Every structure is written in C-alpha cells, then in structure tokens.
Amino acid sequence: MMDQARSAFSSLFGGEPLSYTRFSLARQVDGDNSHVEMKLAADEEENVDSNTRSNHIGVAKPKRLNGYVCYGIIAVITFFLIGFMIGYLAYCKRVESKTDCKTLVPTEPSETEETETFEAENFPQTPRLFWADLKILLSKGLDTTDFTRTIKMLNEDYAPREAGSQKDESLGFFIENQFREFKLSKVWHDEHFVKIQVKGSNAENSVTLVNTDSNSLVYPVESPEGYVAYSKATTVTGKLIFANFGTKKDFEDLKMPVNGSLVIVRAGKITFAEKVANAQSLDAIGVLIYMDRANFPIINADVPVFGHAHLGTGDPYTPGFPSFNHTQFPPSQSSGLPNIPVQTISRAGAEKLFGNMEQDCPLTWRTDFPCKLVSSPSKNVKLTVNNVLKEIKILNIFGVIKGFEEPDRYVIVGAQRDAWGPGAAKSSVGTSLLLNLAQILSDMVIKGQFKPSRSIVFASWSAGDFGAIGATEWLEGYLSSLHLKAFTYINLDKAVLGTSNFKVSASPLLYSLIEKMMQDVKNPVTGQSLYRDSNWINKVEKLSFDDAAFPFLAYSGIPAVSFCFCEDTDYPYLGTTMDTYDVLSKRVPQLNRMARAAAEVAGHLVIKLTIDFELNLNYEMYNDKILSFVREMNQFRVDIREMGLSLQWLYSARGDFFRATSRLTSDYRNVETRDKFVMREINDRIMKVEYHFLSPYVSPRESPFRHIFWGSGSHTLSALVEHLKLRQKNSSAFNQTLLKNQLALATWTIQGAANALSGDIWDIDNEF
C-alpha cells in the first residue's frame, strides 16, 4: 500500500525527486547558500544503484509536461475563485443596509419560505406606475365623479356662510370629516381669531343727494344692502366725479382734480382696494362703486354688491404676524387700510346719480346709460358708512397624503370655503374640486397605483372674502419654515366661470409645467387642447390681491398658480346674492364637464410635481424676466448717467444669475436621477429660487409683499421703473436719493438670488 502511494505521489510530479532550497541564516564562506535534496528513505537503495550506473550511462532528462498542466489547472481554479469572491463581495456592498447577503450554498427552503413564495406568486405587488399610467387612472376617476352634486349640496345646506358664521364652521367640520373618510395620512385644523368689518346693526349706510348751499336733503339715493369691508366709518359730503374704472390711467385721462370730491367708479379691471387707493392718493374724500350693464349684464338693477377695501391680504389689524389667540402684540393696523369711506351701490342707484351730473365723458368711457363726468353745481353727494369691526374665530382645515420618499416636501392645493351670499361660483366650485380631488388621489394611493415621492396637502381656507385672511394668517404663522418645505401652491377658487377661455396666472417657475398640462388637457366643450397660443406666456396676468395664491407668491416666496375657465367678460354675479347654483348652472350648462376639466388641470399639476425625481420648476424662466427688466432700464440710460449712476452692476447681477442657472442645469444633466442625496440638494436649490426674490431689505411687517417682481411697494422693480418715469414727467416729485436706494437694493436682490442658486460659497463666481 505504501509503495502504491509513493508511486502515485511520485508520478504526480513527473517522477522527480522532491527537493527544496534552504537558506541558512549565516552565509557560507563561498557565498553560496546550502542546497539540500530531500529524498524518500525507501528510495535510497535505488538511488545508490542509479548513481553507480550514472558513471557509465548518460542521465535522461525527466519529462515535466504533467507538472505544467497541473500547475495551470490549479492557477486557473485559483484565479476563478478569487474573481468570483471579489464580484460577490462587491455585489453585497451595493445591497441596501436592510438586506443581508444570502449564502452561496443553496439550502432547502423552509416551510415558511415556501408559503411566502406561494403568496408572492399569487398576489404580486402592484408595480409603481408613472406618468402615462397615472394620467389614465386620474381620468377614469374623474369620469365617475359628479362635481355638481357637491356644488349643489354646498349651496343648499351651507349658504350663506360668511366667515366666522355657524354655517362656515359647520362646513369646515364637514370637510374635516370628509378628509378622514378619504383616509388621508393625517387630518387637522387650526384656529385664528381675526377682525373683520360688517355692517352696523344700529345705523344703515346711505347715499343721498343734498343741496350745495344748505346741505339740505334733496332725496335719498339708496341705503345699500351690500357694503365694502374695511371702509372708514364716517360721513363725507362733496361733489361727485366719475373716474371710469378708477385705474391710474383713468385718473390721468380725467384731467380734473378730485381732491375734496367723492369719486364714482365702475367695478372691474382692478380690485376694489386698488380703486380706493388710487382715489385716496389724489385726495378724494370717498368712493362709490357700481356694476354697469355693459360689463355686468344683470337684469336686476338693484342687486347688492359686496367687496373689501384692504390693499393687502390677511387680518389688517395684525399686519405681518399671525392672529393666533395667544399672541399679545400691541394694537396696530395695516398701511393698506383706507382712510376714506367706500360703499357699493346698485346700478339703479348709479343711474340716479348720473341723472344729476353734467359734462360728457371721454368716448372710450361711454357706458350703457348717459355718461356724465361731474355732479351739477347745485347738488352734492353725501355718503355715510356705519360699518363696525367684529372679532371672529375662523378655522382652516387640512389633510395630507404623505410622500413615500420626501414627505417633508409638499405641494399645497387650496380653496376658499366662506362666501358673502350663496357663493356658488366663488367658493362652492373650488370646495367641490378640493374634496373630489382629495378622494380620487387618496384612492389611487390606497390601491397602490399612485406613490407620490412628495406630500400633497389639501387646505380649506376661511375668511377668503375679506382678503384671503385664512391663507395669509397660516402663512404668517409658519413664515420661517414654509419656504423650506412647500414648493407650490395650486389655487382652486373661481375655477369655473365660463367655457370659452382658459386663463392662468402663475409664477414663471411653473410656466413650462403649465404648458405641458395645457397640451394634455382638452376643453370639454370645444374638444380642443387648452394650448392654443404659443405666445400664451406673454398674456399671463399678475396675480391680484383678491387671489389666495397672491400671498403665497408675493409674501412667502412659494411658486403659485391660479386658473379658470371663463368668458371674455367678467362673471357678473361674484360678490352678489345672485351667485347661486341655479344661476351658475344656467350660465354654464356644461358645469360638471367644466368642473371635471378644472380638476384634471389641478390633478395633472399635482401628479407631475410629486412623482418625478427632479422638481418640475423651470428656474431658467426668470432669466427672461430679468432681461426684460434690464432692457426697460436701458431706456433711462441718459437719466441714470445724468445722476452719476451706472447700470454696470445690474448687468453683472443679471449675468451672474444666467451663469448660475446654466451651471445648475449642467449639474442636473450630469447627476444620476437615482442619486437621491444629490437630487435632493439640487431640488432644494431650485425650490428656494422664488424665495430669494423676496427683498431682504424691507420688513415683512411694513412691506409684507416683498417679491421684487410680483410684490407691492417701493422695493419692487415696477416701482423703480415708475419712479424713473416720474423724473421725466414731474421732476419736482422725483426723489434721487430714493432712486439710488431702489436701484442698489434691486441689484443686490438679484445678485443674492444668483448666489443662492449657485450653491456653496466656493462655487460662487461673480464680478462683485
């Protein structure tokens, strides 16, 4: 047996003797290392004989072929195993921390594993759906929704629902319960204690004609049922002057001083508050507002009208800070409150006043009845306003669908809940859209069809009729953090007022997304795409003070959008007692289909903003806005040079912003969309672009709407341009020191936005 083993072992190495080389610790004298040949003891005798024969016979060289083959096989196997292990370990490192690397040796599945495998095969997980599939699912959900049922219910069960009333609160709790039934991730509400102005119960508001010489009563014109909130409560008397719509241009075209006089203007074009502010700036003592037949074709001539005169949003008696019950600020009031009385009158009352006026109006001002400019010399108008302040509690209702990956980033969808009067078009449509969208999107999430990366917040606001009070107070309460989390606001108020046109007002950051949406959504009446004009961006109107989206954009720096289906003329019943479901359904016979289209518009925006890894906000659109401003400023180069100033730094700021957007676009293209950390860092830079256009050089309390493009005040770019125009028109009213400040601060605000967009301070490369 030993012989066989030795033979096999020896043959494995080609029959060669086994040897090794030993290196001694001490060198030999001749410098050679000792060489020892190791032999098997049993072979010694054979080797002796072999050595004896070697003296006579030449030694044959042993064959080494078998040894080479063996070494090669061992090397190949070794390299294969090493490569396999390296690949396996590299794979294990890529697996998420929660996943353990499985053993390479297959084992028999346990009984539990077999059961789980069986269940997985029979009940596969719903795959994550993307835009094309979600668009179809949303459409199917909208097709089975009856929007008019909700609108009608709100009109029958919760009207009228003035802010703070029992019906307003009851509707709020109804919406809160609905959100819970829809199984939203979380539902809650917050309370605010605000001051609104209502008609006095002890004395009526009135408009009368009196004799010029004795102020004796000629005859009463009207004791209106409607009123204008936040008017000054007082009595004034003076001649009456017609100023068309009360715009700044109308007062310029009037070419007649209005100081010491009352002004009568038509409703429309601009808000009540702006009309009053324009008249007050020219020292008028009071304002009357009416709806003419040409723009508001209401058959009933004595329909009362409601509005507000606060040139701002939120509670005007807590400007810049939230009106929570526990806040203890000293008494203060907004600078946007008027110091003159304001009152709405019916068309019938306006006709009586025009019957006692003279001098023809400009041709472009002609209305449906004889248009006269000024009251007759023998008669004056007396206006009495007895409105009183009232403190009320309002509720804002919220529900959220939490995002799967970035729940701390959210889009907000909101609608006004209250209304002076029935409010079918003003608030019922928006509330219906809000409720049904929440239900449809929540169902899609529950079924595993829709997995939004970011959260969706649904909000029902109160006191919207008094200047977006509910929305603004909420923004003021969370001013320090909202711009870091909320990246878009979608307003649903007054979304359906007609069928012919689709109008949109929005931040430039949303233009590209809106255009894609318009290409996908069709007008249900015409069957045509909402995208009908490639030049639509140039026709976008600024958000007005009366729009709840305005404070999100101009106060908080959150991109916002407001849209509506409408006609060429204004919807005539807003703010009146005729804003009912019956009137709306007659005015818009395809009401349910139009409401479905409005919900589809909002739904498309919500889904696109929450499913993609990249944030769908086109920051490059502001390059065009800044360039337009620079071009406008270039028209005043001579004036600026005469003042010893230069536009060089403005050019540099504009260039830095352009380079910052280009660099960010390059970063976007180079990063892998699956690299969530880098994508989030880039998205955070994008979502703050709007915020960085809020001027840091003015106080949110003194000038709450700090946005240099869309805000209000001397810090805005439009105010800077208007001030330069004043130098050419009326140099005595021009303030050079103010202009220097305006130019410097506007330049630095743009530069600050460029720096913020660039990212870290070591990435900033500008000429300042």
Swiss-Prot record:
GO cellular component terms given for this protein: external side of plasma membrane; melanosome
InterPro entries for this protein: PA_dom_sf, PA_domain, Peptidase_M28, Peptidase_M28B, TFR-like_dimer_dom, TFR-like_dimer_dom_sf, TfR1/2_PA
Motif mapping: Endocytosis signal: 20-23
Phosphotyrosine carried by residues: 20
Modifications the protein undergoes after translation, according to the UniProt entry: Stearoylated by ZDHHC6 which inhibits TFRC-mediated activation of the JNK pathway and promotes mitochondrial fragmentation. Stearoylation does not affect iron uptake.
Location of the region described as Ligand-binding in the Swiss-Prot/TrEMBL record: 577-768
Subunit structure, interactors included: Homodimer; disulfide-linked. Binds one transferrin or HFE molecule per subunit. Interacts with SH3BP4. Interacts with SH3BP3. Interacts with STEAP3; facilitates TFRC endocytosis in erythroid precursor cells.
Lipidated sites in chain (S-palmitoyl cysteine): 70
Protein name: Transferrin receptor protein 1
Sequence intervals crossing the membrane: 69-89
Motif Stop-transfer sequence boundaries: 61-64
Biological process according to GO: intracellular iron ion homeostasis; iron ion transport; positive regulation of B cell proliferation; positive regulation of isotype switching; positive regulation of T cell proliferation; receptor internalization; transferrin transport
Phosphoserine carried by residues: 10, 19, 24
Family: Belongs to the peptidase M28 family. M28B subfamily.
The keyword Transmembrane helix is assigned to this record: yes
Source organism, top-level taxon: Eukaryota
Residues carrying sugar: 259, 325, 730, 735
Predominant location category: membrane
GO function term, MF aspect, one: transferrin receptor activity
Extracellular side of membrane: 90-768
PANTHER family (alphabetical): N-ACETYLATED-ALPHA-LINKED ACIDIC DIPEPTIDASE, TRANSFERRIN RECEPTOR PROTEIN 1
